Amino acid sequence: MELATREKVNEVLFMNRGEGESSYAQNSSFTQQVASMAQPALENAVETLFSKDFHLQALNAADLGCAAGPNTFAVISTIKRMMEKKCRELNCQTLELQVYLNDLFGNDFNTLFKGLSSEVIGNKCEEVPCYVMGVPGSFHGRLFPRNSLHLVYSSYSVHWLTQAPKGLTSREGLALNKGKIYISKTSPPVVREAYLSQFHEDFTMFLNYRSQEMVPNGCMVLILRGRQCFDPSDMQSCFTWELLALAIAELVSQGLIDEDKLDTFNIPSYFASLEEVKDIVERDGSFTIDHIEGFDLDSVEMQENDKWVRGEKFTKVVRAFSEPIISSQFGHEIMDKLYDKFTHIVVSDLEAKLPKTTSIILVLSKIVG
């Protein structure tokens, strides 16, 4: 199955469900580290809203691509805590928080809402009562009424594309990115161009719909997987998909996966540079950039001395976010073998140390008028 349409991607793009060993809920520690690095930006965004003369009675906030797990709860707690702090400082009365949790229809909303406790949202008698609603659907379309959101947050979601890039087969129907699932050193220039073009189209669409939904001067905090280097085929940018492609190729060589399935599969994700992100925002013209920065974190927990333990932990993280979309192409029955092979490749690469993972923090304000 080629991920050539939005409909197909929307069906299979979600994190591993439940609370089992391979679930996203149990393997989201890396994205938790990323979110903690961006927490000051979120706190500052909430504080900024109180200085923009909104005359707030209720703050409407949305977490787009929320998945299911502790990271979502931390976002709610941070917003609520900052609102309570500002209310005490400004002596606000009857201020409420409405949080909308959004993701695609395949997301595990049951696990998400089962995890919501009074510790996260508090009770309705507190100084800032919190109300939480689920909003299933694609954030590449309209989700909310016009001028209704004060704050938009999204972590590690916007780098996912609506579909595999267009134009990755020749006129004769031959795969142009043969043996790979993402941009690599062996990919022809057309592959890089197609990925950037698809990201430009999708991110522009994302900004356009958010500009319709957000109030003037509303704040948006985005965290996305990105890259520091200029070259998108640099291993620092693409190593996860490169190693996964090697694991798939190993199973192809063993006759366990059809080679054509590998050649026709391209992951619908793009790790943009800061310059590319900034350029798209400026071209769109709906938002001002209040802050943009990139930072690197270790891809594997370096505190653990045993390289096999480190490799297995990294595999669980990758499996949690990649298995649904990978299994849709190569079959559920082969997944244990595939990720076992991936672990072996990761462990061998640990000898040379895996590259760090780059994330981008982007803080935007909607332009008035």
Swiss-Prot record:
Transmembrane segments: none annotated. It is an enzyme of class 2 (transferase). Caffeine binds at residues 31, 156, 159-160, 225, 321. GO terms for biological process: alkaloid metabolic process; methylation. It catalyses: 1,7-dimethylxanthine + S-adenosyl-L-methionine = caffeine + S-adenosyl-L-homocysteine + H(+); theobromine + S-adenosyl-L-methionine = caffeine + S-adenosyl-L-homocysteine + H(+); 7-methylxanthine + S-adenosyl-L-methionine = theobromine + S-adenosyl-L-homocysteine + H(+). Coiled coil: none annotated. Pathway: Alkaloid biosynthesis. GO terms for molecular function: caffeine synthase activity; metal ion binding. Its cofactor is Mg(2+). Binds 1 Mg(2+) ion per subunit. Disulfide bonds: none annotated. Mg(2+) binds at residues 177, 263, 265-266. Keywords: Alkaloid metabolism, Magnesium, Metal-binding, Methyltransferase, S-adenosyl-L-methionine, Transferase. S-adenosyl-L-homocysteine binds at residues 24, 66, 71, 103-104, 138-139. Its EC number is 2.1.1.160. The record marks 153, 225, 269, 317, 332 as: Involved in substrate discrimination. Pfam families: Methyltransf_7. Caffeine is catabolized to produce theacrine in Camellia sinensis var. assamica cv. Kucha, but not in cv. Puer. Belongs to the methyltransferase superfamily. Type-7 methyltransferase family. Involved in the biosynthesis of caffeine in cv. Puer. Involved in the biosynthesis of theacrine in cv. Kucha, a caffeine-like xanthine alkaloid with diverse beneficial biological activities including anti-depressive, sedative, and hypnotic activities, improving learning and memory, increasing exercise activity, and preventing nonalcoholic fatty liver disease. Catalyzes the conversion of 7-methylxanthine (7mX) to theobromine and of theobromine to caffeine. Has 3-N- and 1-N-methylation activity. This is 3,7-dimethylxanthine N-methyltransferase TCS1. It comes from Camellia sinensis var. assamica.
